[in-house]
Amino acid sequence: MARIAGVNIPTNKRVEIALTYIHGIGPTTAKKIVTKLGIAPERRVQDLSDNEVLQIREAIDADYTVEGDLRRQVAMNIKRLMDLACYRGLRHRKGLPVRGQRTHTNARTRKGKAKPIAGKKK
């Protein structure tokens, strides 16, 4: 297994697909990396030489924020919004949808499991 950006990428998959196992690299970015380095996209990871794996590793380290750094950056952005006490920060703090979705009904993923309230007694 090749280890790139702290992730063991699967050896039996195509290079483009295998790179998407790294957090922060999607299909488009993987395709850009492969074409930039001149690696055939249909090649499998197990067929890559050590030099090619090193080239991929260096390209990712130089040009992209991935894995732990990306997760930390996203968490810091959310924390910054919460510290500013802006509308989006308050929504994050309360655990409600941030991007204007309705909350009268729905939003269960963000709000969590419904809390039962006493029903109407007959």
UniProtKB/Swiss-Prot annotation:
Pfam families for the chain: Ribosomal_S13
Source organism superkingdom: Bacteria
MF GO annotations: rRNA binding; structural constituent of ribosome; tRNA binding
Alphabetized UniProt keyword annotations: Ribonucleoprotein, Ribosomal protein, RNA-binding, rRNA-binding, tRNA-binding
UniProt-listed SUPFAM superfamilies: S13-like H2TH domain
Gene Ontology biological process terms, A to Z: translation
A GO cellular component annotation in the UniProt record: small ribosomal subunit
Record keyword Ribosomal protein present: yes
Region entry Disordered, spans: 95-122
Quaternary state and interactors: Part of the 30S ribosomal subunit. Forms a loose heterodimer with protein S19. Forms two bridges to the 50S subunit in the 70S ribosome.
Record-stated family: Belongs to the universal ribosomal protein uS13 family.
Role according to the record: Located at the top of the head of the 30S subunit, it contacts several helices of the 16S rRNA. In the 70S ribosome it contacts the 23S rRNA (bridge B1a) and protein L5 of the 50S subunit (bridge B1b), connecting the 2 subunits; these bridges are implicated in subunit movement. Contacts the tRNAs in the A and P-sites.
Protein name: Small ribosomal subunit protein uS13
Gene: rpsM
